[in-house]
């Protein structure tokens, strides 16, 4: 029996799945973040090693140093350029050579697959390698691949340069609308009251204290998108316009990916991933209606599997290639 590791490494945590050649998950391990560009190589390597060890410990099989693990796929945040891939492959090889991985043989270079976290999200979401992943959580990005293996990325430029249609984008637009109404220069909206109540503020001027002086980051601000979503679901016109604008941005990015990968006669799947899609304002439904107009044969789906499972599938593909 052959085994593989599938690893999903992000800025918050690292997940490793131990899978067999029949695509059965035998073990799962979690550790800290593994974005080497923000943490450094050593800390990223430690998180990956720990996630692997924990996956093996949780496996329902007898595990020893002779476990026949033949391939590994690491889908990591911030990995996209050839240089990034070389760096990750090097430190995985280093883990093998220092005997810090419980494997019976050194992996061939082709069996150390390194790709972006978007790629494994697509494969995990659809269960195969073709289609489009529309990811909208704290940030946003669209990533697709066609049946010929051509890939297309749209967006993903971060909260300063991009991330249109993301939770952060929605939250910032909502906060700005609330403050404009508070100033008397904006359209009336219940967002002002909702933010004030949710954050426990005496007035909206205290937002300065919350956002700037408490050192709120992108993730904390993005969490406020739920307030905008709820206000839109309750019929607030300003909030609804913000949600519509966010969906329009995601549609534009998706349309760009489609035009670069598929033609009008092809059927393919579009998987929606991230917290924005699960709100009360029916972002998913709005998105589906718009997609049907630009890609009639496309099917919008929810993720079938998690990204780490997608990494495992890519590792298995490496064995069969």
Where are the regions that the model predicts?
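ATP-binding/phosphotransfer module of carbohydrate and carboxylate kinases, centering on a glycine-rich
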Residues: 1-68, 124-130, 177-321
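Short glycine-aspartate micro-motif
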Residues: 4-8, 69-73, 113, 131-135, ...
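A short glycine/serine-rich beta->alpha loop
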Residues: 36-38, 78-79, 156-164, 297-302
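Short beta-strand-loop/turn "lid" adjacent to the catalytic site in phosphate-handling enzymes
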Residues: 55-96, 104-105, 113-114, 123-126
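Glycine-rich beta-strand-to-loop/alpha-helix junction loops that act as flexible
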Residues: 73-80, 136-138, 268-279
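Active-site neighborhood for divalent-cation/phosphate handling
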Residues: 101-133, 144-152
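Glycine/charged-rich beta-loop-alpha catalytic/anionic-binding loops adjacent to active sites
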Residues: 102-106, 150-158, 290-299
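Glycine-rich phosphate-binding loop of actin/hexokinase-like ATP-binding domains
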Residues: 128-186
